């Protein structure tokens, strides 16, 4: 029996399953090249966040987790559940590929950008985050980077949790994972989150609609998974999750219906996966199919989401993946096929008729070590039903010139396909071409006197950016962006203290006008201090968010406005009352700084949370 249970665990930690690992140098990651490898062999800059990290930071949202990571800048139109944007290394929010268990998140069909404020943190057991182009591995969207959210649990057990906080915040949840018999594992989880929120419109600098009320958020989440080991080599699994979100925001009146105030968003999302894995000492393969369906309503709550004045963004997404990897020499070769179909239902507000977009991608990856030199490459061809074939490639080389020190050079191409709204919406243009990018990067990394560090410089040229033509009243390819940046990270211990440092310099500009791209801070400093003192686990976070620019849409013509820099401190502490019960407390924005990440939208100010978890 012990042998069988160990076998099930080993089969679960495959190149494609995403079972959580420790975040140290021996951590195994799967996102960089779609096969399992130690994180210290990945040539692209990579960050791993575990569930233990999330609990230590006491984050309440996925956005709160991501903002701590290198190369990340975020903007949000208020508090929990409000519209958010994720910028990686200065690229657009639509230039980051969001995966859930290796499958593209079905949330960006019409709008083109995934809003991580709507994804439940309760589902997140691990995040693997890759910076730089990855279209040669994954296809569209992976211009700035890839974020892979992994939902599978690391170990068996049952956890019950509850929390309260500022703005009437409440959270209640539970999960259990059990091994049945010798070779079957079952996981069930549920979560409920609610906050009354605060008025998201900032005072004194927004000419829009004044709506002095609280803008709250509520989420309900369910998750289930079943995994079975048929033999030493074959494993099958099925999993599903769904969530319902309701968000109140400061809305708008429509000129055609001046008595209707649209200020509520209701999102329903469900996803189902099923797969079969094969593993032996040299060869690994997985066949995975997935179906997801999302309905995103915006409406006047007095009239309901089915009223004619409501809007609906409804997308169905179908995915089939066949991924393979074989160990060769001192490395690995991977190859596979992706097929995806996105469908809009007739009646979707932004796309009146029903449309389908199909994409088939074939890719090849390779990683090989030759003495002190490591080479990595990937090539991919996508066949899209709208714009035809598109090819991408990338290559990297690392030279360990002194033991423990290496230089890495990389180049890659990437692209972003036009979304359904840009193609078929009210102002759509079905002749749009994909947005394209070329990125160069050079980096040094090493271990010096106990300090694990990395310094890199990069340039990203993005062409064919899609913009809106006011004269023609349609989308067209016109824009160009030139992004240059420097990124530095370091981690080290001093006695009982663990330090993590990050510095980002990003110069992201419109190549035609030389204007800075909005909502990107030119400089950021991030610092994390963790320690244990008398059984209390302490976590101190510092974040300097530099000056940014945004657009004031309340003026005509619109004007650029400057958002000042800010220094933010968070402090969190936890205490294990028993071996099963842990209590936690956190103060976010310790010094109650007043700042904005999106012009005209307030942030929460100082917030308190108190929570506890019981594990058995």
Curated annotation (Swiss-Prot):
PROSITE patterns, per database record: TONB_DEPENDENT_REC_1, TONB_DEPENDENT_REC_2, TONB_DEPENDENT_REC_3
Keywords, alphabetical: Calcium, Cell outer membrane, Ion transport, Membrane, Metal-binding, Porin, Signal, TonB box, Transmembrane, Transmembrane beta strand, Transport
GO molecular function, one term: metal ion binding
Binding site for cyanocob(III)alamin: 83, 85, 92, 110-111, 311, 519
GO BP terms, alphabetized: monoatomic ion transport
Pfam families reported for this sequence: Plug, TonB_dep_Rec_b-barrel
Transmembrane segments: 158-165, 169-178, 184-195, 217-227, 232-248, 265-279, 281-298, 311-327, 330-339, 355-371, 373-383, 387-402, 405-419, 436-445, 451-460, 475-492, 496-511, 519-531, 537-552, 560-574, 587-598, 604-616
Residue span of motif TonB C-terminal box: 599-616
Signal peptide coordinates: 1-20
Broad class of where this protein is predominantly found: membrane
Reported function: Involved in the active translocation of vitamin B12 (cyanocobalamin) across the outer membrane to the periplasmic space. It derives its energy for transport by interacting with the trans-periplasmic membrane protein TonB.
Record-given protein name: Vitamin B12 transporter BtuB
Encoding gene (name): btuB
């Amino acid at each position: 029996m012990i042998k069988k249970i160990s076998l099930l665990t080993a089969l679960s930690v495959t190149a494609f399953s995403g079972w959580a690992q420790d975040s140290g140098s021996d951590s195994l990651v799967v996102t960089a090249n779609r096969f399992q490898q130690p994180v210290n062999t990945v040539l692209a800059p990579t960050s791993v966040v575990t569930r233990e990290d999330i609990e230590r930071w006491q984050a309440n949202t996925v956005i709160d987790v991501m903002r701590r990571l290198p190369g990340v800048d975020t903007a949000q139109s208020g508090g929990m559940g409000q519209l958010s944007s994720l910028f990686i290394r200065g690229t657009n929010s639509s230039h980051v590929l969001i995966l859930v268990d290796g499958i593209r998140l079905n949330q960006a069909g019409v709008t083109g950008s995934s809003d991580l404020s709507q994804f439940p943190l309760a589902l997140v057991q691990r995040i693997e985050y890759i910076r730089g182009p990855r279209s040669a591995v994954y296809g569209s969207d992976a211009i700035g980077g890839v974020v892979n959210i992994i939902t599978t649990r690391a170990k068996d057990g049952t956890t019950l949790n509850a929390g309260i906080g500022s703005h009437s915040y409440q959270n209640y949840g539970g999960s259990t994972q059990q091994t049945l018999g010798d070779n079957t594992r079952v996981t069930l989880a549920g979560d409920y989150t609610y906050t009354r929120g605060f008025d998201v419109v900032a005072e004194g600098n927004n000419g829009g609609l004044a709506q002095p009320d609280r803008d709250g958020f509520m989420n309900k989440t369910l998750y289930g998974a079943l995994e079975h080991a048929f033999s030493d080599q074959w494993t099958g699994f099925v999993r599903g999750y769904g969530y319902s979100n309701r968000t109140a925001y400061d809305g708008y009146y429509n000129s055609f219906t001046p008595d209707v105030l649209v200020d509520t968003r209701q999102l329903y999302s469900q996803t189902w996966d099923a797969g079969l894995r094969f593993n032996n000492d040299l060869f690994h393969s997985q066949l995975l199919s997935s179906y997801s369906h999302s309905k995103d309503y915006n409406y006047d709550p007095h009239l309901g989401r089915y009223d004619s004045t409501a809007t609906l963004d409804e997308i169905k997404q179908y995915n089939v993946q066949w991924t393979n990897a074989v160990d060769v020499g001192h490395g690995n070769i991977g190859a596979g096929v992706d097929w995806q179909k996105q469908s809009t239902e007739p009646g979707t507000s932004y796309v009146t008729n029903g449309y389908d977009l199909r994409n088939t991608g074939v890719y090849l990856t390779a990683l090989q070590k030759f003495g002190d030199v490591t080479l990595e490459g990937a090539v991919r061809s996508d066949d899209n039903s709208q714009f035809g074939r598109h090819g991408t490639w990338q290559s990297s080389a690392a030279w360990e010139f002194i033991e423990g020190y290496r230089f890495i050079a990389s180049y890659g191409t990437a692209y972003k396909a036009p979304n359904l709204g840009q193609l078929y919406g009210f102002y759509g243009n079905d002749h749009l071409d994909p947005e394209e990018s070329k990125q160069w990067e050079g980096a040094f990394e090493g271990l010096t006197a106990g300090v694990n560090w990395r310094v890199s410089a990069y340039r990203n040229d993005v062409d064919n950016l899609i913009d809106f033509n006011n004269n023609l009243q349609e989308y067209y390819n016109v824009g160009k962006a030139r992004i240059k940046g420097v990124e530095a990270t370091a981690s080290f211990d001093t006695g009982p203290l663990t330090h993590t440092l990050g510095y980002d310099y990003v110069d992201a500009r419109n190549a035609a006008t030389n204007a800075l791209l909005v909502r990107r801070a030119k400089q950021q400093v991030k610092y994390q201090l963790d320690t244990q003192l008398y059984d209390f686990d302490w976590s101190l976070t510092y974040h300097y968010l530099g000056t940014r620019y945004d657009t004031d849409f309340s003026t005509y013509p619109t004007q650029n406005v400057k958002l000042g820099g800010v220094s933010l401190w968070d402090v969190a502490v936890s205490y294990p009352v028993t071996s099963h019960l842990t209590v936690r407390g956190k103060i976010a924005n310790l010094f109650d700084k007043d700042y904005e990440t999106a012009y005209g939208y307030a942030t929460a100010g100082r917030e308190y949370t108190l929570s506890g978890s019981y594990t058995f």
